Amino acid sequence: MKKTFCFILILVCIVLKSVNAEEEDNFEESSLEMETARCASKNERCGNALYGTKGPGCCNGKCICRTVPRKGVNSCRCM
């Protein structure tokens, strides 16, 4: 009985430690993004998840996207 209790206690400690380590990694990544995050000015390229484009959001205005006819790709700019 005592061995089973110790075994369960050790497993719980390992699980809690791994969950805590993942949270710390996520915190470091999000703080890095905050430092490097910037917004796009008027007429600069921007990102729009609906169109599958990556990039910063717009400082002012909206991210307007259009499909380039011959290439079939989306191009987004701040307006």
Swiss-Prot record:
* GO terms for cellular component: extracellular region; host cell presynaptic membrane
The protein's UniProt keywords, in alphabetical order, are:
Calcium channel impairing toxin, Disulfide bond, Ion channel impairing toxin, Knottin, Neurotoxin, Presynaptic neurotoxin, Secreted, Signal, Toxin, Voltage-gated calcium channel impairing toxin
Instruction: Tell what the record comments on domains.
Output: Adopts an inhibitor cystine knot (ICK) fold. Is defined as a knottin (one disulfide bond crosses the macrocycle formed by two other disulfide bonds). The presence of a 'disulfide through disulfide knot' structurally defines this protein as a knottin.
Disulfide-bonded cysteine pairs: these are 39-59, 46-63, 58-78, 65-76
Q: Which residues form the signal peptide?
A: 1-21
Superkingdom of source: Eukaryota
Lineage, opening ranks: Eukaryota, Metazoa, Ecdysozoa, Arthropoda, Chelicerata
Chief subcellular location: secreted
Compartments in which it is found: Secreted
Miscellaneous remark of the record: Negative results: does not affect frog neuromuscular junctions and glutamatergic and GABAergic transmission in rat brains.
- Name of the protein this chain belongs to: Omega-phylotoxin-To1a
Which residue numbers fall in the propeptide? 22-38
